[in-house]
Amino acid sequence: MKILIAEDDFVSRKILNTQLTPLGKVDCAANGNEAFIAVKMAFEENQPYDLICLDIMMPEVDGIMALKKIRQLEAQKGLSTETRSKIIMITALSDKNHVMAAAQANCDGFLVKPIEKKRLFDEIRKHGFDIPE
């Protein structure tokens, strides 16, 4: 599995990286702009991400805008709902506006920090990934 973590907080990024590394190759981005560039490069290399974990509150380009840009790029590439990356929004913000904005931008899941490994893996399994308990 190829995974991208987009998280501006170093500690949160490190924790997610540690949790997800056993599942496959993990790349990290510190903001939404870096995340979009990573996704674009992955397409250019014909190795798109299977899973993307996007924080909502990030500098330069936030997670919602990055999500919209990624989904737009996937649509341009002709990817269907089944073949595009699974994108899970991860945030400290649980208010309805952020949840609705992420849902309207076609995220696949939503987790509120702090992220426990079991909750993260349960969410990943919901999207068809066969990962260990």
Role assignments for model-derived ranges:
Residues 115-124:
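C-terminal output helix
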Residues 43-53:
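Active-site beta3 strand of CheY-like receiver
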Residues 52-55, 66:
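Active-site T/S-Asp motif of two-component receiver
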Residues 65, 77, 82-83, 94-109, ...:
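Alpha4 helix (beta4-alpha4-beta5 surface) of REC/receiver domains from two-component response regulators
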Residues 58:
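Receiver (REC) domain active-site loop signature in two-component systems and cognate sites
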Residues 1-10, 16-20, 52:
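Conserved acidic segment of CheY-like receiver
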Residues 8-10, 21, 28-41, 63:
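Helix N-cap/capping motif at the beta->alpha junctions
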